[in-house]
Amino acid sequence: MLIAAPSRRRFMQGATALPLFGATSVFGADKPSAVIGRVLAMSDLHSAYERSAQLLAALRAEVRSHPVPHLIAIDGDIFEHGNVVSVRSEGAIDWAFLAALPAIAPTVVNLGNHDNDLTPDLHEVVARMRGLGITVLSNIVDARNGRPYAPAATELTFGGRRLRIAGFGTNSLNTYPKASRDWLSIPDPTQWANIQLPTLLDGADLTLVMSHAGVAGDRGMLSALPDGVLMIGGHNHLLFQETLGRGLYAHTGSWSNAYTAADYLSDGSVRAQSRTVALDGPADPALAALIRTTLNRHLTDQERVILGTSSTALSLGDTGRAVAAAFARFAGAQAGFIGHTTLGTGLSAGPVSRYAFDAVVRFDGKLMAAEVPAARLAELTTLANQDRVMPFARRTGDFVYGAVEGGEQRETVRIVTTDWCALNQHEYFGVTDLAFAEVPGPGVKAVAAAGLLKP
C-alpha cells in the first residue's frame, strides 16, 4: 500500500517555539498576594560567553528593582569542555561570573554532568565554589571513598522566612567527563527523590527543589512533592512551566539565553516569568572586558576563520530543524533528525566563525541512515520538536529536532540522524529496532555548516 509521507509543512505545524518571555501565573486571585521572596533560576549555561555579561547585568537589575529577598539558583552545567576558550583559560570567565553572584544575592549551585568538565575531581570544583561564598548541593557520591561531594540539602534565611533547598543530578554516567566516571556513584534520581525528599523537606517553611536529572527522571517524583514547592529542572535544555497545585515545575532554558524569575507569594503559591537575555542587551562592564581579553588571548586564527554567513538569526529550535533538513538533503532522505543537546545555541545573523559555529553544533560525528515503512514516520516524529507548546505528559526530556522533506507517496522512507541518536534510539525515537548504516562522506558539523551558511 502506498502511504503519503507527511509534508515538511504539516510536520512543522504546531512546532512554534515557546516564547522566551511570558508570565505564567499559577493562581489568579481577586486581590494579589504579596511577594515574600524571589528565586532567579537558570541552568545549563555551558560557558556561553556571548551572553555571560548580559546575564550578569540582568540578574543585578532584577535584584535592584525588586526590594524583596532574592536567591540565585544555578541548576548545573556551568562549564563546557567543547568551548576551546573555556578549556584553555581554565574557565576564567565562568569563575569570574560565579564570583560576582554572591555580591548580588545568596547563590546556590546544584551540580550537573558538565560541572567537572575542566576540573575532573568534583571535590576541587565544590571547594572553589564554596570559597566564593556559593552554597553547593548534590547527591553524587565519591565512589572511591563513599564521601558525598556536597550535601543534598540545606536551609537558608530568606528574609523573615526559611527556604529549604534540595538538589540532585542525572545518573546518565556517559554524559559526565570520561576521566571522572569511575569516581562517581549516582543513584537513580526518581528512586532517590521518592525515598530521600520526604525526609529532607520535612517541616520546611518554603521549599526549592533543584534537579539536573531531566524530565524523564523528574516525572515520577512530582506527585510526592509538597504543595507550594518550586522545582527547577535542567539537563534537557528546555523552557517550559508546569503547575503543581500551588507550586511550579520549571525548566529555564539554556546557554544563557534565558532565566526564570520565580516569586514565592504570601498565599503559599509560586508564580514565575521567563526572561530572555538579549545578545545586544546591557552587559556587565567588567565581565564584558574580561570576555574580550580572554577571547583575544586564546582564540587561534583557525578558530576565527569565517565559515560562512547566516542571512537571519534562528531560534535554537529553528536551527535544529534547519540542520535536520540539511541532513535529509545531503543523505537523499525524506526526514532528518538531530538530538536536542547536540546543539548549543541558535544561529546568529551575519558572519559565523568556526568558534561561534562550535557553540551552535557542539558535537561532531557520523551521519546514520535507516529505511523504514512510511507508516512509521509519524511514530518516529511524535517525540520531535519539543520546543513547542505541548502537554507535559508527552514530554520525554531527550528528543530530536526533526524536519520532513517532500510529500511524495512511497512505501518506505529514508531517515537520517547522528550516530549518537542512532546509538541511543530508544531515548530519542522511543524505539529500538531501527537498523542504521553509516552515510559516507562528511560528518555532522560539515553537513550542518553547509546547510546553514552561505559562502
Describe each model-derived feature in a short phrase:
Residues 29-282, 318-326:
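Acidic, metal/ion-coordinating pockets
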Residues 17, 68, 227-228, 332-333, ...:
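Short, well-ordered coil loops that connect the C-terminus of an alpha-helix to the N-terminus
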Residues 1-2, 183, 367:
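Short, flexible active-site loop motifs that bind/organize anionic cofactors or intermediates
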Residues 23-27:
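Hydrophobic membrane-targeting alpha-helices
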